[in-house]
C-alpha cells in the first residue's frame, strides 16, 4: 500500500481467503457522531474518499454539518480512482500532456513527472461516421474510411500509450466508452496494493455519469480537470445538495426505459438540479434493471445534475454476474457494500435536500424535441408539437403541408418528413429490452408487409459487440437488416453528429425549398445543428420508436391512433413485454460478454499495423493539421497578475441555453468557415476536412471553429445565423474569429454576455480553450452549466453572473459598448462581488454588480497561474 492516512480507521476484510484493508467508515462516522445511515449513499462514497485521501477530522465534520441543513458551502477534495476518456476529448488531453512535458523541460523540470498516477482508459468511439448504410458491408466500409481519415490521430494515441504510464487505449471499432465502462471496465469496488475502496471516476465526456447506474460514482469534467486528476491533483468541490427521487410502481403498457429517462429529464430540468447530486431510491428500484438505471444515469447532463446515483443492491450483483465479472470480484463487492453500509437498505430511508416522487406506472410513450432533450412530448402529441414549432423555424402555416419532388426519385418530401432514423448511442443500445424490442418490431413490420420509406437514412450503431452478438443469436438481426438497419459501426455516430451525408438529391430538395426535415434517434441530445446540418428538427426516442418512425417516414402522424400502413397500426406490431423478456432470457449470457471483452485492447489488423516512434516526448510535425503543439505554455513561468479588465469590447451577446455545441461544434466543417480557409490554405481538400471533433488536437482549427456553429445566433447581428459579430474597431460584420484576431492584434480585451444555462451540453473543454485563444477575459451570464463553468476557470476565463433581476436584455446592450470590470485583484475570494461599468457610445455610463462564479480557493489559484495546466506544471516542478 502506498501512502497511509488515518490509519486508525483501517481494518481487515476477508473475502474467499483473501484479506483486504478497508477504511472503516462506520467507525469514522461514529467517532464524529455522524449517523451514517441518514447520509445519502452517494455522500457515503464521498465520505470514504475523503477519509482515505488524508481527510482531517474537520474535513469529515463537513458531512455531519451537511445533515443539519442538507446543503453546504464547505469544500472537499475528491480523488477519483480512475479516469475515462473518449478520442474527441482524449486527443486534446494527451496533446496537453505532451505539451506539459515540453513545458516542464523548458522550465528545468523532469518531463517524466508528467505521468498519470491513476488508471486512464481511452476508448476510441467518436470518429466513425455513417458514410455507408443499409448494406451488408456498411460496417467494413465505414471502418476503412475511419482509419483513412484518422490515421494521424490514432498514431498519436498509440504513441501516448507507450509514452505514458497507466494509460490504455481501446482501439476503434470496439464500442462506446460508457457502455464499455458499464459492461467491462467498472469494478464497483476497486482494489490496489491490498486496499479495497469504492470504484469512482471522472471522465472527459459528460455522459460518464452512465456508470452511476451500476453504483459507481462518477461524472464528466473538462479535459483540463481530468489532466489534473491524472497527475494527482484533487478535484476540489463543494459538498453538493442531494435531491432524492423516490421511485414507486413499475413501467406499464408500452412504456420503456427511454420513456422513463425522458420523463425524468423533463421533471428534473424543471427542478433546476445543476450542480447537485440526484439519488434514486424507493420500492421502484426493484422493478428497474441495471440497464434501465444506466439509461437514467446516462442522461444526468441533460437534466443538469452532476450525477444520478443508484445504490448497490441485488440488481448490481446480478448485472456483474451477467456481464462475466470474476466471481471473487463480485463477492468483494457484496461483502464490502454490506460491511460499509453501502448496500441499499429498503427499511431505512436516507435524508435528502429535497425529495421528489415518481410513479413509474405514470410514464407514457414519448419523444423529446425538436431541439432540447428536456422537451418531452407524449407520442400522440408529436405531430401537433412539430406543427406548433414550425413557425419558430421560419415556416408559415400555409407551407406546412407542401410536398416537393426529389430529383430522379419517384417520391416527394416535405416539412416534418423523417430523413434520418438512427438506432444509436450508449444511452439505449446498452439496454437489451429496447434493442430486442426494436428487432421484434422490425420482424412484425415485415410480416405485415411494411417497409421503411425510401427517403429515410437508417443505421444501427450499438455501443458494444455484445449487442450484435445477442441479436445474431436470437435470429432477429436479419429483420433489422432487411429494413435497412444494418450495422454501420461500434461508436457514437449519429448521436454526436457523425450522421454522414444524406442522398444528394434529398439534400438538394431540402436546401432549395428550405424544408424543416427531421431526425429521430435513440440518442441523448438533439441540440440545433448537432445531428445533421440539414435536420433542423431532431427528436429523441427509444430504438423501438426509431424503427416505427422509419416506417412512417414522417412526424406528421399520431402513431397511437393513425395507421402506419394500410389498416396496420403501431399497436399491431408492438412487441409485448413477455416476448421481449423471453428473447432476453434465451439470447443473452455471460459467456458472450467474456468472449467479446477478452481482447478489448488488441484492435484490428489496421490498428496493429500503425507505425509509431518510441519516445518520451512527442516529435511535433509543424505541418500537421491534426496534431499541433498548443500555445498555452509559451508564457510558462511568468506571473499572471489578476487585475481589472479595462476598455473591453463585447465579442458576442447570446441568449439562453447556449450549448458547448454552439461554442465549439463537433460536427462537419462548413466550406465557408475560417477553419475551412485554414485547411484549404494547408492544401486539404473539402472532402478530407473531417470534423471539428477529429481536429481537436490542432488549436489552429479549433480556435477558428469557436462560435462557428451554423445555428448560433449572436444578438449583435440581427437576423443572422452563424458565427458572426460586429467588429467595433471597423464597424463591419465579420466572423467572430476574424474580429477576435483584430482585437488581439490591437491589445483589446473582449468579453461575452449571455442568458441562462450558458455552456450546457457536452463536457467540451475546447468550449473554454477556444474562447481563451480568442482573447476572451470574462463571460457574463445569468447562469452557467456546471462543467463549462469549471472549464472556463481552468483556462483562466472569469465566469460572472448578474445580481438581482439584471439580464443582458434589461441592459439593452447592442454590442457597441465598452466594458470595465472593477474589483479584480490578487486578493479575490470565491464568490467575490465586482463592479461592471458599461459605457455606451452616447457617453452614457451604467454600473452594475456582478458575482464571480469561482467556488474554491484552488480555483483562485488556477486563475492566478493563468490556467490549471500552468498550476499543475509549476507545482510538479517543485
Swiss-Prot record:
Pathway(s) the chain acts in: Carbohydrate metabolism; tricarboxylic acid cycle; isocitrate from oxaloacetate: step 2/2; Organic acid metabolism; propanoate degradation
List UniProt keywords, sorted A-Z: 4Fe-4S, Iron, Iron-sulfur, Lyase, Metal-binding, RNA-binding, Tricarboxylic acid cycle
Which EC numbers characterise this protein's activity in its record? 4.2.1.3, 4.2.1.99
Q: Does the keyword Ribonucleoprotein apply?
A: no
From which residue to which does any coiled coil extend?
A: none
GO MF annotations for this entry?
2-methylisocitrate dehydratase activity; 4 iron, 4 sulfur cluster binding; aconitate hydratase activity; metal ion binding; mRNA 3'-UTR binding; mRNA binding
A GO BP entry: propionate metabolic process, methylcitrate cycle
Q: What class of enzyme is it?
A: lyase
Q: Which family does it belong to?
A: Belongs to the aconitase/IPM isomerase family.
On subunit structure and binding partners, the annotation says: Monomer.
Protein name (database record)? Aconitate hydratase A
- List the taxonomic lineage: Bacteria, Pseudomonadati, Pseudomonadota, Alphaproteobacteria, Rickettsiales
Amino acid at each position: 500500500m502506498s501512502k497511509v492516512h488515518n490509519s486508525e480507521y483501517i481494518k481487515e476484510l476477508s473475502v474467499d481467503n483473501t484479506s483486504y484493508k478497508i477504511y472503516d467508515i462506520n467507525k469514522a462516522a461514529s467517532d464524529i457522531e455522524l449517523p451514517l445511515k441518514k447520509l445519502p449513499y452517494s455522500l457515503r462514497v464521498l465520505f470514504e474518499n475523503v477519509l482515505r485521501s488524508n481527510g482531517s477530522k474537520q474535513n469529515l465534520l463537513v458531512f455531519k454539518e451537511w445533515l443539519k441543513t442538507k446543503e453546504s458551502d464547505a469544500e472537499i477534495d475528491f480523488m477519483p480512482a480512475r479516469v475515462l476518456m473518449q478520442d474527441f476529448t482524449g486527443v486534446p488531453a494527451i496533446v496537453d500532456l505532451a505539451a506539459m512535458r515540453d513545458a516542464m523541460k523548458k522550465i528545468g523540470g523532469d518531463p517524466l513527472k508528467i505521468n498519470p498516477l491513476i488508471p486512464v482508459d481511452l476508448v476510441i468511439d467518436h470518429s466513425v461516421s455513417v458514410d455507408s448504410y443499409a448494406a451488408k458491408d456498411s460496417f467494413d466500409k465505414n471502418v476503412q474510411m475511419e482509419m483513412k481519415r484518422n490515421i494521424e490521430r490514432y498514431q498519436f494515441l498509440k504513441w501516448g500509450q507507450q509514452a505514458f504510464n497507466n494509460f490504455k487505449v481501446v482501439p476503434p471499432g470496439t464500442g462506446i466508452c460508457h457502455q464499455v465502462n458499464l459492461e467491462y471496465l467498472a469494478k464497483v469496488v476497486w482494489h490496489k496494493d491490498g486496499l479495497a475502496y469504492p470504484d469512482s471516476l471522472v471522465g472527459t465526456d459528460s455522459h460518464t455519469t452512465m456508470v452511476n447506474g451500476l453504483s459507481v460514482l462518477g461524472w464528466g469534467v473538462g479535459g483540463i480537470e481530468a489532466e489534473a486528476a491524472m497527475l494527482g491533483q484533487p478535484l476540489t468541490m463543494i459538498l453538493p445538495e442531494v435531491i432524492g427521487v423516490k421511485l414507486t410502481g413499475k413501467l406499464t403498457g408500452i412504456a420503456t426505459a427511454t420513456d422513463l429517462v425522458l420523463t425524468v429529464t423533463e421533471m428534473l430540468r424543471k427542478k433546476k438540479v445543476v450542480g447537485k447530486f440526484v439519488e434514486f431510491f424507493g420500492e421502484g428500484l426493484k422493478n428497474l434493471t441495471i440497464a434501465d438505471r444506466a439509461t437514467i444515469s446516462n442522461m444526468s447532463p441533460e437534466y443538469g445534475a452532476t450525477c444520478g446515483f443508484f445504490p448497490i443492491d441485488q440488481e448490481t450483483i446480478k448485472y456483474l454476474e451477467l456481464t462475466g465479472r470474476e466471481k471473487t470480484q463480485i463477492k468483494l463487492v457484496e461483502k464490502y457494500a454490506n460491511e460499509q453500509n453501502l448496500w441499499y437498505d429498503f427499511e431505512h430511508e436516507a435524508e435528502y435536500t429535497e425529495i421528489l416522487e415518481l410513479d413509474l406506472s405514470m410514464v407514457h410513450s414519448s419523444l423529446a424535441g425538436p431541439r432540447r432533450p428536456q422537451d418531452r412530448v407524449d407520442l400522440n402529441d408529436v405531430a401537433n408539437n412539430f406543427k406548433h414549432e414550425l413557425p419558430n423555424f421560419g415556416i408559415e402555416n400555409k407551407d406546412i403541408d407542401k410536398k416537393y419532388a426529389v430529383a430522379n426519385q419517384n417520391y416527394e418530401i416535405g416539412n416534418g418528413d423523417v430523413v434520418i432514423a438512427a438506432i444509436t448511442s450508449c444511452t439505449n443500445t446498452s439496454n437489451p429490452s429496447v434493442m430486442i424490442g426494436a428487432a421484434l418490431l422490425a420482424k412484425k413490420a415485415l410480416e405485415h408487409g411494411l417497409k421503411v420509406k425510401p427517403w429515410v437514412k437508417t443505421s444501427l450503431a450499438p455501443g458494444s459487440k455484445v449487442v450484435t452478438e445477442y441479436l445474431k443469436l436470437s435470429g432477429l438481426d436479419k429483420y433489422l437488416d432487411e429494413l435497412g438497419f444494418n450495422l454501420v459501426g461500434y461508436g457514437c455516430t449519429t448521436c454526436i453528429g457523425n450522421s454522414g451525408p444524406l442522398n444528394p438529391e434529398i439534400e438538394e430538395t431540402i436546401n432549395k425549398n428550405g424544408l424543416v426535415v427531421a431526425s429521430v434517434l435513440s440518442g441523448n441530445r438533439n441540440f440545433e445543428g448537432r445531428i445533421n446540418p440539414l435536420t433542423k428538427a431532431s427528436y429523441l426516442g427509444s430504438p423501438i420508436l426509431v424503427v416505427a418512425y422509419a416506417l412512417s417516414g414522417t412526424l406528421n402522424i399520431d402513431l397511437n391512433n393513425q395507421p402506419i400502413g394500410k389498416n396496420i397500426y403501431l399497436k399491431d406490431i408492438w412487441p409485448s413485454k413477455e416476448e421481449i423478456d423471453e428473447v432476453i432470457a434465451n439470447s443473452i449470457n455471460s459467456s458472450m460478454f467474456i468472449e467479446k471483452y477478452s481482447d478489448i485492447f488488441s484492435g484490428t489488423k489496421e490498428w496493429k499495423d500503425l507505425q509509431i516512434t518510441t519516445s518520451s516526448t512527442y516529435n511535433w510535425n509543424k505541418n500537421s493539421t491534426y496534431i499541433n503543439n498548443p500555445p498555452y505554455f509559451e508564457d510558462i513561468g511568468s506571473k499572471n497578475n489578476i487585475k481589472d479588465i479595462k476598455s473591453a469590447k463585447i465579442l458576442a451577446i447570446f441568449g439562453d441555453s447556449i450549448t458547448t455545441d454552439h461554442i465549439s461544434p463537433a460536427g462537419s466543417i462548413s466550406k465557408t468557415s475560417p477553419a475551412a480557409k485554414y485547411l484549404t490554405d494547408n492544401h486539404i481538400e473539402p472532402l478530407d476536412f473531417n470534423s471539428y471533433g477529429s481536429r481537436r488536437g490542432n488549436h489552429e482549427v479549433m480556435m477558428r471553429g469557436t462560435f462557428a456553429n451554423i445555428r448560433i445566433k449572436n444578438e449583435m447581428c440581427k437576423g443572422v445565423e452563424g458565427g458572426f459579430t460586429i467588429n467595433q474597431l471597423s464597424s463591419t460584420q465579420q466572423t467572430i474569429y476574424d474580429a477576435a484576431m483584430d482585437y488581439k492584434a490591437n491589445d483589446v480585451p473582449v468579453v461575452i454576455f449571455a442568458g441562462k444555462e450558458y455552456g450546457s451540453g457536452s463536457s467540451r473543454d475546447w468550449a473554454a480553450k477556444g474562447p481563451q485563444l480568442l482573447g476572451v477575459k470574462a463571460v457574463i451570464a445569468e447562469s452557467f452549466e456546471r462543467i463549462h463553468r469549471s472549464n472556463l476557470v481552468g483556462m483562466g476565463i472569469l465566469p460572472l453572473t448578474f445580481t438581482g433581476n439584471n439580464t443582458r436584455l434589461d441592459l439593452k446592450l447592442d454590442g457597441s459598448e465598452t466594458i470595465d470590470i472593477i474589483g479584480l485583484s490578487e486578493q479575490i475570494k470565491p464568490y467575490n462581488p465586482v463592479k461592471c461599468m458599461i459605457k455606451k457610445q452616447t457617453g452614457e455610463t451604467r454600473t452594475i454588480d456582478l458575482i464571480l462564479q469561482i467556488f474554491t480557493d484552488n480555483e483562485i489559484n488556477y486563475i492566478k497561474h493563468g490556467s490549471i495546466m500552468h498550476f499543475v506544471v509549476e507545482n510538479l516542478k517543485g
